[in-house]
Amino acid sequence: MAPAVATWAPGLWRACNALMAAFFALAAVVQVNDPDAELWVVVYMIPAVLTLLVGFNPLVTGNFIWKSVSAIHMLFCALWAGGLAYHFLLHAKQNLLNEEEGRELSGLVIVTAWMALCHSSSKNPGGGRMHLAIAVVITLLPLLSWVYVHMNKEMRSSWPTHCKTVI
């Protein structure tokens, strides 16, 4: 007999998707005064919309168009993250979150990880326990990172001007 899906699991999956959609939308909004804002707004708005759709209807991850857009976006973000990681390894002077490229790399990794998690949920839209545990960790990661960065005055002092004037 197959184990029954916990009654709270679909609600938790939807809540994680709602929080991640809000995070991605906020990440897009704070790019407004970045020198390459148009690129980063697209990078964050695509997963914001795709994630919002999953929050409304978890079965959308089985849709061909949703799967295609998410797969292409994941590939693009993974390749870009690889290039940034290589650059960061060669030129890093400080902690990952102190460097703009490090924060960009973190954003791309979060986008790729979340989209991969959503992409894999098409077989079990409610999510299994491990799937939900990973979802909760990924959902908390950006929130905790932003709190850490915004509370750390030393880190904020090294930011470029366009990062200091957004929020």
From Swiss-Prot:
Keywords from the UniProt entry: Membrane, Transmembrane, Transmembrane helix
Topology of the protein relative to the lipid bilayer: Multi-pass membrane protein
Keyword Hydrolase (UniProt): no
Transmembrane residue ranges: 10-30, 40-60, 69-89, 104-122, 130-150
Subcellular location(s) per record: Membrane
UniProt protein name: Transmembrane protein 220
Signal peptide boundaries: none
GO cellular component terms, A-Z: membrane
Organism domain of life: Eukaryota
